[in-house]
Amino acid sequence: QIARMDKTQFVVYVARLFSRKGYAVKLTPVADNYCIDMLVEKQGTITAVSVVQSTGLLGKNDVACVCEGRRHYPANNAMVLTNSYYDSSAVDYAREHGLALVDHNVLASQYMA
């Protein structure tokens, strides 16, 4: 089902998943959003979320723009969420910069369950 969605459909789908988990969700503008697709808030903590739909592994460059992007929003944390997986360079970069990474397995087990 997710594989057939376009980017906008996937972002809306993820927003609904967050809403069902009790988050307040605010979608950012489609253009000029600094790689941040939505802000999610729960218990006073705001997370800037980048939603990446991909058929291949995501690398460092795929997650790096989120570090810069979160500075443009009132967010405490940042997350990259994908229907795919991350390579080791993305994982290392995220660890260094305090980014949360959600891959296909985590998406299926923690958000879609």
Question: Would you name each region that the model predicts?
Answer:
Residues 1-113:
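Mixed-charge (Asp/Glu-Lys/Arg
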